[in-house]
């Protein structure tokens, strides 16, 4: 005789709740991006933040004229509830509230009309912080949905402005990835 398992409405509800909880725990969905900045298989999104900040440029003298050169970003990244997740600064680097840090290097870019390009960055180095390791397992970072941040008009960089800096407002969404199956 085969064993018989009686499944009642309560059992079905418990199973359904477990399935929904597992789906919710799966983490944020991967964004739809151009092929040039797609993250390789074997990675999954674990954190998404909306950046609000500035791209900093310096006016420099160059052979035959003057030019605005990129210096660094300065931004805060927030979650969907408006809670601060990380700060973003030169390197390019991101530091979480727990002190963990990731430094990225640009792998590729996708141009965007009227804004700084979308980027794929690989984690060049990571470290845990004194209070946790939120960013310590990062493998890739994507910068997408950019607005603003472009260098000032070339004409505004001249002999009278050499050595000055300009802070240009920008926003972007940053997706942080880790290897599938990695910790935290």
Could you describe each region identified by the protein language model?
Residues 11-19:
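Bacterial N-terminal signal peptides
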Residues 27-54, 63-184:
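Primary mode marks residue(s) on the alpha4-beta5-alpha5 output face of response regulator receiver
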